[in-house]
């Protein structure tokens, strides 16, 4: 059985930047499966302007498990919808994991994408500026 890392990525696009697409959508949610020990990353699911719910997420995990993948973790940005999904799965600071629906004796660990968060902070500082008092 292959070990994989299930990566949940929420991408937000501005309409004017997407020159190849002129539809009514403001964002797209994409889920990728990525190898933990193998070098691959494959998109497995996407929907426009959609919030991924607990049942739908667990169905995707079960489908990946049925295909022979051993799902061991999920990573995502800290969008409110992702925090809500994590909470619905029972993820907390003390227990950053939840039981794998296909293998209840195993856990799936939940990670937030720190590099993405640092990029958001950088962009906020560039866009909004900052004040250094006393200098």
Identify the meaning behind each predicted range.
Residues 13-70:
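Electropositive, glycine- and tryptophan-enriched low-complexity nucleic-acid-binding patches
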Residues 1, 51-135:
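Histidine/cysteine- and/or acidic
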Residues 1-22, 73, 89:
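Folded interaction cores of globular domains that provide primary macromolecule-binding surfaces
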Residues 6, 15, 37, 83, ...:
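Sequence-pattern detector for short linear motifs
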């Amino acid at each position: 059985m292959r070990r994989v890392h299930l990566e949940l990525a929420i991408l937000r696009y501005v309409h004017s930047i997407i020159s190849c697409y002129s539809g009514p959508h403001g964002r797209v949610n994409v889920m990728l499966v990525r190898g933990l020990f193998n070098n691959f990353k494959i998109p497995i699911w996407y929907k426009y302007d959609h919030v991924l719910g607990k049942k739908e997420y667990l169905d995707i995990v079960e489908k990946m498990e049925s295909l022979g993948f051993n799902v061991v973790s999920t990573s995502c940005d800290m969008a409110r919808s992702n925090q809500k999904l994590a909470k619905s799965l029972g993820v907390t600071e003390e227990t950053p994991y939840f039981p794998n629906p296909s293998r209840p004796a195993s856990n799936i660990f939940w990670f937030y994408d720190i590099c993405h968060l640092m990029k958001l902070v950088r962009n906020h500082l560039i866009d909004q500026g900052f004040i250094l008092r006393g200098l």
